[in-house]
Amino acid sequence: MSLLVKAALILKCASMLQGVSAQYFCRDTTFDKRTLESVRFESECIPTVNKRDLDPNAEGVYKRSFDGNMNPSDFQLLPLAPRDGAIVNVDKESFSKRSTTNMFDFNFSCYFGSDGHSNDTLCQQYIDVADSVGEQFSRVLNLNTPIVIDVTVVGACTGESVCSQGQGMVAGSIGGEASPSREIPMACSDGLTRYYPQAVVKQLGLSDPPSYADSDITIALNADANFYFGSGDMGYEAVDLAYVLFHEITHGLGFSTGWGVFGYENLTDPYMNALLPTVSYVIGEMNGETMYAFHDVIENAFDRNIFYSIDPNEGLPTIAEFFHSVGAAFTLKADSIAGVVAQMNDTTTQFHIQANEAYRKAINPGRLVIYPDAGIDTYSPFIYLDSSYVPFSSGSSLSHVALHHYDCEPNFLMRAFYTAGATLESYIECAYGSDQADVAYGPIGPAMRTVFRRMGYSVNNLTGVTNEYSESLAKRSLSEKPKTAPTGKQLALHPLRRETSILDSTNTTSTNATNTTTTTSSSSTASSSASASSSTSATSGAAGDLFSVSKNLMMTLTAGLCLITASLF
């Protein structure tokens, strides 16, 4: 082989390795009003330090890129994840509905009509509703640092948009979408790394914080939706904007999964799907040999609350613990790659069978739950998450509570569907009925408060507090507060995005079109957006259920094999 050809081959192989890195990165999200979708990318916001500069007394935890004598010997200092947030008792007599400063700052950009013109009067209506929602959130969450939210109001065919006939997250939904603007990797007490939303990291008062994005939450709203702004008559097909904003802000604060469904092409099963969180891989050398290893498994802070079993006595570990136990042991020598690829392509292997079973369980309702820890909340032994979509939908699965369990119950807000023509107040009245003890929390139900606390937010104790929600409920007679859910047309708050599945006989191509991430070291769908995706349940809990290899890993292995082959000539 000529030197020119060999050089070209090596360059081609090296290009396949783009996206593989030994560093931790923050995950950022911005909204592209031309494509009407969120753009995901990574940014280097966590400082990297050299091994010789390690300070054992420094705040945080050092994560090594490689174990033993593997090179490079870079280390990174990850901030420590917060402990469970506190429950803050308040003076119930003085804690009036206007006693708390609004800790939410909204930056609105509004584009209306086909020319994308601004309408200050109409945009102000959005702002007024958002400020009211921010005030209520500020009464529930005990915040010490303001949370900045960028909100884009844009239609399906506005200004620079591609006018794509409903394609795009915002255009395809009545509400829109929301994501943390930046997610920061943090070292948790269980030895795992998880992505935490910037909004909660800012509350920790870190002495050496990572770099922060300009905003904490990014929200996009569909300007073509028939929004109700809280005054006048509400049409039977209108959508209460306050409801939508409460829902989207909750996603942006961290109520979203880092798990996604992945399809990768292999030789014998081109449409096999697998479920996994963000997985980083590294390539290095040890004793002169090229090595391929998992860098880390990184799920969202939200995912720490998710369990397979609805029986806490089984003591099953969390999703990440299953996967991490396998990933930590998965280190390949270069000469082993061909055999591993062949094994993954063999449909008779346990790996293939278990990955298939994992996907099946992910579309089985009632398998995935949030367990409140003892002392966090005693509201319920567990909270059902939504895993009812067949095929799996990264637009609605897991980042919402089960639809029919909570249609007239205090956790109603995080259902994936909204009843047209129903006001937020009608949902609250239905959820609480004659029980006014906790109605001051309004739409921020116990499931949300539990998740917020597990991520590190402090929550005010509003039991027995009087505010506009309790006052409104008190004005009605018991006969006017039936435990019946609002009726009307059911509208999806987020577009239902379907991934091709080996279980879906109607599809014959592998589509992961919703994966807008351009991350450099991970495989992930648009996991943290309000239309975030989901995960599976398994009462048996076999680690192999989650040891599912993404296309990124396949590319890594293939690229490594390519480089080895090139070096032989």
UniProtKB/Swiss-Prot annotation:
It is found in: Secreted; Cell surface. The keyword Secreted applies. GO terms for cellular component: external side of plasma membrane; extracellular region. Residues 1-22 form the signal peptide. Coiled coil: none annotated. Residues 505-540 have a biased composition (Low complexity). Residues 498-541 are annotated as: Disordered. Keywords: Secreted, Signal. It comes from the Eukaryota. This is Uncharacterized protein PB7E8.01. It comes from Schizosaccharomyces pombe (strain 972 / ATCC 24843) (Fission yeast).
